[in-house]
Every structure is written in C-alpha cells, then in structure tokens.
Curated annotation (Swiss-Prot):
PROSITE patterns: HTH_DEOR_1, HTH_DEOR_2. Residues 20-39 bind DNA. Residues 3-58 form the HTH deoR-type domain. Transmembrane segments: none annotated. It comes from the Bacteria. Keywords: DNA-binding, Lactose metabolism, Repressor, Transcription, Transcription regulation. The keyword Disulfide bond does not apply. Repressor of the lactose catabolism operon. Galactose-6-phosphate is the inducer. GO terms for biological process: lactose metabolic process. Disulfide bonds: none annotated. This is Lactose phosphotransferase system repressor. GO terms for molecular function: DNA binding; DNA-binding transcription factor activity.
C-alpha cells in the first residue's frame, strides 16, 4: 500500500472512531509499527490528529465534506461555464492535453472545438463527452485504474504507472480550494495522480470558481506559483491581487 493510500485510510478511520491505537492500524494495514508511527507524525503535522500514548486522537478537522458529483453540477453553473470558455481559448490545434476530474473541466470538454487534438483523461464524464467528438485526428484516451466514485475519476497504482510514461503540452485541472499559495483537494490518492500528471505537462492551468478562493480542504497537492495561469470568474480586486502574487490570472 502506497503512503498516500495509508494516510487516507488512517484519516478515515480516526475520524470515524475518534481515537486509534498504533497496534490496530498495524493489523488493519499490514504494515510495520514504525511505518504507522511515521504516518501518524505526518498527519499530526497536517493538523489531522494529535498523537497520544499508544495512538492518536482526531482533531476532527475533516469538516469539509466533499460534495457529490451531482451536487457539484448544481453549484456555480454560470461561473463554471465562463471559466470553461476562457480555458477552451487556450487549447490549440495539435495539442496533447490532460484533463483532470471536476465539473468545470467537464464543461471545458464540452467547449473544446478543435479538430486535431489528443486528449488524455482519468475522468469518466470527461471521456464520455469527448468520445462524441472522436475522429482520426481527434483522439481521446481514458486512463483506467481504481474508480473514485465521488469524482468519477480513476486513481491508484495502475493509473499512475501509465501516467509515468506520458507527456502533455497542456494540463487543465481543478481543485476543491485555494488558500494562499496552496491548491487543495479532499483525497490523497486523487491528489497524487493529479500531481503526477502536472509534473508531465509543459503548461498547467487551474480552473477554479470564486467560491473556492480562500477555502481550505484536506490536503495540499500543488502551488499556484508552479502554474502557468489560474483561470477564474473572480472579480474581487483584493482576492485577485493576492492571487497575482503567485501566478498569472485569467478572468
């Protein structure tokens, strides 16, 4: 089991039970005592839990209950359409692009109107939208793996092994929150896959609506300063000024 998978399992367990013991985590995850203690120390550093004798106690910070795919589709619709249209202007003929999961990225998939393109995605809805546009010069690839139902995206070792062999001219992705320089999401595993894809893209564009600016989530997985640009509907001058310290803003 990879580290990000262990951290996610431990987080789920401790937030369900309130407290956990090292011995029960060792037995549940089939890893060493030392590995569990290192994981608990890392999660303590993230503010997820507090170490106590023989185990840990939840800090109950996992208060950001991730919305379902259907709920996300009903929020900030006009704003997401605006962002998707702006992002679509950056897609060029001949590009090889990676599209991550997220309802705003799905809207981008609908907006794409190029005829010579290669698109790779780990998101089932994005693939379903783009597969309607396939041709000899418009190719769409879906990465398989373990399905994360809440975002309908594929994650895990199989997904990541395939990703390691790929390179992209551009990547468009989203997140659940942006705070300071940090881009945040709810899942270690999904974050790991997103970060891996970002490392293989030349240009990197974050699609984020104004409701997510200033919002925290469970784990940080990328920094604004590493982006090519952030695409948003936000018109708040104060927020835009703060964001522009880290990256270019397209709005």
């Amino acid at each position: 089991m990879r580290k990000e998978e262990r951290l996610e399992e431990i987080t789920k367990l401790i937030n369900k039970r309130g407290t956990i013991r090292v011995t029960e985590v060792v037995e549940r995850l089939k890893v060493s005592d030392m590995t569990v203690r290192r994981d608990l120390t890392e999660l303590e550093g993230l503010g997820v839990l507090t170490r106590i004798h023989g185990g840990a106690r939840s800090n109950n910070i996992f208060q950001y209950k991730e919305m379902s795919h259907e709920e996300k589709h009903s929020r900030q619709i006009e704003e997401k359409h605006y962002i998707a249209q702006k992002a679509a202007e950056l897609v060029e003929e001949g590009d090889t692009i990676f599209l991550g999961p997220g309802t705003t990225v799905e809207l981008l998939a609908e907006e794409i109107n190029k005829t010579t393109l290669q698109v790779i995605t780990n998101c089932l809805p994005v693939f379903q939208i783009l597969s309607q546009k396939q041709s000899e010069t418009f190719r769409v690839h879906l990465l398989g793996g373990e399905m994360r139902s809440i975002t309908q995206s594929f994650i895990g070792e199989i997904t990541n092994i395939v990703l390691e062999k790929m390179h992209f001219s551009k990547m468009f992705f989203s997140g659940n929150g942006v705070k300071g320089n940090e881009v945040m999401t709810s899942s270690f595993q999904e974050a790991y896959t997103q970060k891996m894809a970002l490392g293989r893209a030349i240009e990197k564009y974050l699609l984020i609506d104004s409701s997510k600016i200033g919002k925290e989530d469970f784990t940080s997985f990328y920094q604004l300063s590493q982006l090519t640009a952030l695409i948003t509907d936000c018109q708040d001058d104060d927020k835009l000024q703060k964001l522009s310290k880290y990256t270019e803003i397209i709005n």
